[in-house]
Regions:
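Alpha-helix boundary/capping motif
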Residues: 31, 46-47
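Intrinsic disorder/low-complexity segments enriched in small, polar and charged residues
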Residues: 19-22, 55, 60-65
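Single conserved hydrophobic/aromatic residue that forms the stacking wall/gate
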Residues: 1-15, 393-404
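Short hydrophobic targeting helices and cationic amphipathic motifs
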Residues: 34-37, 51, 81
Length: 404
């Protein structure tokens, strides 16, 4: 039946719906994907979450056309950031964000919610550019690090707010083996590959598939052999700002071959504001009782898990980020501070659960981070001076010392 009869507005009146386990499902037609592949997008809309799954359109029969799962090569990851602050109509703004080195125009999309919170994202690298949050006094603070135009993102190597792909984090020796074949990647950090090399997805202009008052979806086609990875890989990333002050980041992708995929967002957070100085007095809780020790300063894990208890790596209870960062502890000395993988205490594998809580007493801003992945990399911004911010990006568990 029609969503108009459910009181959800004229804009949805052509969209078919049904209910599942007491939840309303909206079926929306998606087009414009490379290769003209037809797809249906089924979205569950609840007060606090936005969960999406994609299915290939196989038939036009009765009921929900083609609502069949794709083959095994489906990648879906979800990351939520919820910022708590101390009513306004939604709207989306689109404006120029400068011109790239090859003469293409980049665009900036700004979303706002009824609480006065705003986020800005750009089609260049699908970057999260800014997150403006009212503090305890109602003053807006930009709590992520970034630049005012596309030029900064083209020239800086810190990956502020970047959508990293095809693989986030490090691959030792810049090579991996899959099904008996060795794939060589670019060596862009010592002898290793970091964030897929110098031609990462964050240095490309993405296509905008959808943009409305609450969400923007960027899409990219990465061909077989791109960056050295096998398979034609189609990926989308959707940024959503909710009225619950949640920034939701959804990744969806498919590939025609087995490949390595580890998409992530690379935003640095300073909850006092991007220009407020040190984060050492801001506090952090990580839902992780184990971490991955590294071999050396290259931050490649040794392939084992170690307990955080009794070490400076223990953030299981609230602790200032700078409290033990200079402790006489080998792992911190190797990496110049925190730059380690933490294994999350997941109640249910693959479920969306709280992974971290960061707080700033001075601003009154608290951020909760949720993910459906098993690990989080915590980087305290050891080498991004003069600005300061901490980075939390999610990932699968490192399999051995070959991959971080």
């Amino acid at each position: 039946d029609c969503l108009l009869s459910r009181g959800l507005g004229d804009v949805y009146k052509r969209q078919p719906t049904f209910t599942l386990n007491g939840r309303l499902i909206i079926v929306m037609w998606m087009s414009g994907h490379p290769g003209n592949r037809r797809q249906w997008k089924a979205e569950m809309m609840t007060a606090a979450t936005h969960l999406a799954c994609v299915a290939r359109s196989q038939s036009m029969g009765n009921g929900i056309p083609g609502l069949q799962k794709r083959k095994k090569r489906i990648m879906k990851m979800v990351l939520f950031y919820t910022l708590h602050t101390t009513k306004r109509r939604r709207n989306m703004k689109k404006q120029g964000f400068g011109t790239t080195k090859d003469g293409k125009e980049a665009l900036l999309y700004t979303l706002s919610n009824k609480n006065g919170m705003e986020i800005s994202v750009t089609d260049y690298g699908a970057h999260l550019v800014s997150v403006l949050v009212p503090d305890k006094d109602g003053k807006k603070r930009d709590v992520v690090l970034g630049f005012d135009s596309v030029t900064g993102y083209e020239t800086d190597g810190s990956h502020f707010g970047a959508t990293i792909g095809r693989n986030g984090n490090r691959i030792a020796g810049a090579a991996f083996e899959l099904h008996g074949k060795t794939y060589q990647l670019a060596k862009n950090e010592n002898n290793n590959n970091l964030h897929s090399g110098p031609d990462g997805y964050d240095y490309r202009l993405w296509n905008v598939e959808e943009a409305d008052d609450s969400a923007v979806t960027f899409v990219l086609m990465s061909p077989d052999g791109d960056q050295g990875f096998p398979g034609n890989f189609e990926v989308s990333v959707t940024y959503t700002l909710t009225d619950e002050n949640a920034v939701e980041i959804h990744y969806e992708g498919s590939c025609d071959q087995d490949t390595v995929v580890n998409m992530t967002n690379h935003s640095y957070f300073n909850l006092a504001g991007h220009d407020a100085g040190s984060i050492e007095n801001q506090t952090l809780v990580l839902k992780a009782e184990q971490f991955s020790p590294v071999i050396d300063s290259a931050s490649i894990p040794i392939g084992e898990h170690a307990p955080v208890q009794g070490t400076p790596m223990d953030f299981t209870s609230e602790k200032a980020i700078g409290a033990e960062i200079e402790a006489d502890f080998e792992q911190l000395k190797l990496t110049g501070g925190y730059d380690h993988n933490f294994i999350l205490d997941k109640a249910v594998e693959g479920s969306i659960e709280l992974m971290a809580v960061a707080s700033c007493k001075e601003s009154g801003i608290t951020m909760e981070a949720f993910t459906d992945l098993p690990c989080v990399q915590f980087y305290a911004g050891n080498f991004i001076a003069p600005v300061t911010g901490c980075l939390l990006y999610t990932s699968p568990s490192p399999r051995d010392k070959r991959q971080s």
